[in-house]
Amino acid sequence: MLEPPKFIENDCYNGSRTFTWLADMVGLSVDLVNFLICQISALFLASLFRSMLHPSKVSSKLRHTFALSIGLAFGYFCFGQQAIHIAGLPAICYIVIRTQDPRIVQRAVLLVAMSYLLCVHLMRQLYDYGSYALDITGPLMIITQKVTSLAFSIHDGFVRGDEELTKAQQYHAIRKMPSALEYFSYVWHFQSILAGPLVFYKDYIEFVEGYNLLSTPPGNGNLDSSKREVVLEPSPTKAVIRKVVGSLVCAFIFMKFVKIYPVKDMKEDDFMNNTSMVYKYWYAMMATTCIRFKYYHAWLLADAICNNSGLGFTGYDKDGNSKWDLISNINVLSFEFSTNMRDAINNWNCGTNRWLRTLVYERVPQQYGTLLTFALSAVWHGFYPGYYLTFATGAVVVTAARTGRRLFRHRFQSTQVTRMFYDILTCLITRVVLGYATFPFVLLEFMGSIKLYLRFYLCLHIISLVTIFILPKFIRGERRLRTSNGNGNVRLSGSGNTKDAVTTSVESTAALTAGNDLNEDKEEDKHAQCKVHTPTQQQPAAGPHKTTVEQPTEQPNNVNLRSRPQQQQPHLEKKAMPPTCARDAVSVPHDQCEMDQLSSKLKEKIEAETKNIEEFIDKTVTETVSGIVEFKNDLMRDIEFPKLKLPGSNGAISLDSSNGGGLRKRNISSVHDNGTDPGHATADLHPPLEENGAAFLKKEIEVINAVVQQAVPAVLSNGHAK
């Protein structure tokens, strides 16, 4: 019998056992207690990181050092000696990044990282088979995502041109090699070392250096060019509270119902032989749903930690509320109430979806995208047979769902009632399909999963294959033709009634993640939406209601169909516009119009806030200057009044008479002729007092003039000069 190596002891947790007493008290295993202690500590440390270690107060080096130090401490506390792998994998990959040619660095890093991860997966499977204890493979899976995505971003930035990149690839491209401190801080930062989510390198560096709140983020990887306007930093408090409360609710639901629907009972002979088909489907659906709430709890808490440190801001919604979903891993309600597999996949493990899209789906021929994406996802999870059964089944049902949607959906869009019926029906079907496809993922075993599938009579497998290969021969679905502008589709129903069936829509064909090729038109160019402006969009329309339809031509994958460019716009063909918003690059682009609207709303919100600040400064400066000028005028009026009674005099002295000429003239005159004019005998009685008063007022006026001349330009130039 194989004996486990020193750093892997069978049925033995290697992390700290300091809080064993607390684990016994609350009824949880010590590994889960350690995990919760670290995450709760990270939540409070994140607040300190955002406030006391704000980029305006400390250097980026200090922020990097603090983040990676706390991350390493958490890793050692939770995993003990196994934490050596947290250091080993990224260290080897960093050597590869620094030594290999950028033309092949992405492949080399992917090979090294996946090989290291698979070795650890294999050792865990050999020496701790079927264990659900917290182990080192979880953090290693996140680290693998980080180092491989960084390598591909370096390849995109150093080797490929902008015209070859998708919108997301342009945004994440890195053209400056990371230093050792930046690299290891990115890999080990405490916010995501235990449970994710995946943060792309560029987003993390901009967050640490304080550029993540700039109104005009750079479109390339040169993070050191930073003369840009800073917007007001929004508070993440509401988002953090909402996600922490949601995490607690999900933890309660998991603890409450996981004992009612234990997954292990599905392997028992009594369940397989003595229960009805309907109950089997119901139990599979409920058991997998309960397990999902464990992931909801971990992901929501991890997202709250990132938000509390200031990471994750993406702009404002239509009501002006700040949005903190840049790196969110889950949308619970959107997933649980999704009406098709595409929406379900897009809202589950979003960080991994973005990673798979970046590494695989956008870089391989379109016809192989789904298969290769599911294959990498399965290998990344490990060697348990249940993973491969789930992803193989998922690939089949995803393809069937896309075909079925094309065949049937348009038939239910005539009235509001039929649309509602279709949505409810597809929501229920999606729930059943998810339970059917994902129970092998939690069972892990091959034979147990196969036996249960046979008890299901492979119903959904058969229905999926029939939907893919047989139904299209008998049922005519929607036919799609590309419009002349390259951005829209014309849907043609198979019924032949073009008046009622023809509808125009703008749909994204960018690569969807983790097998998300549910875009119903395979012939659409998935990079077409990456062009912000194209010459075809500038051509005059033939009429206000006229749509020109072109027959689709066969083209290789990733080839754009372009019209002849106009002479006045040759530059638009040469270079694609960089993305202007982080959200454009990280979101799964179902709908490009929605992405453009979000970017526009963010820009409008920032402009509105900036305008309010400018108006406030204008008002403040105007009132200040007006007050100073009025004070000056008042003093001048006092000086130029015709009479001024001086102390000790018997009467008023004329200060603006024809023979006096005012206080200034009298002062000057008294200096030059020493008061010999008989017409000024009264004034000559007190020449020292008069000279002192004039000198004092003259000095005050000169000081005020100097203040006005210096203060007004200084105030106006303090970020407010037009």
Swiss-Prot record:
Pathway: Lipid metabolism; phospholipid metabolism. Residues 485-511, 549-570 have a biased composition (Polar residues). It is an enzyme of class 2 (transferase). It is a multi-pass membrane protein. Its main location: endoplasmic reticulum. The active site is at residues 349, 381. GO terms for molecular function: acyltransferase activity; lysophospholipid acyltransferase activity. The chain crosses the membrane at residues 25-45, 62-84, 104-123, 180-200, 243-263, 378-398, 424-444, 452-472. Residues 485-582, 650-687 are annotated as: Disordered. The keyword Transmembrane applies. GO terms for biological process: germ cell migration; lipid modification; phospholipid metabolic process; plasma membrane organization; sperm individualization. Belongs to the membrane-bound acyltransferase family. Acyltransferase with broad-specificity, that mediates the acylation of lysophospholipids to produce phospholipids (glycerophospholipids). 'Oysgedart' is a Yiddish word meaning skinny, chosen because of this protein's role in phospholipid synthesis. This is Lysophospholipid acyltransferase 6. It comes from Drosophila melanogaster (Fruit fly). The lineage of its organism: Eukaryota, Metazoa, Ecdysozoa, Arthropoda, Hexapoda. The gene is oys.
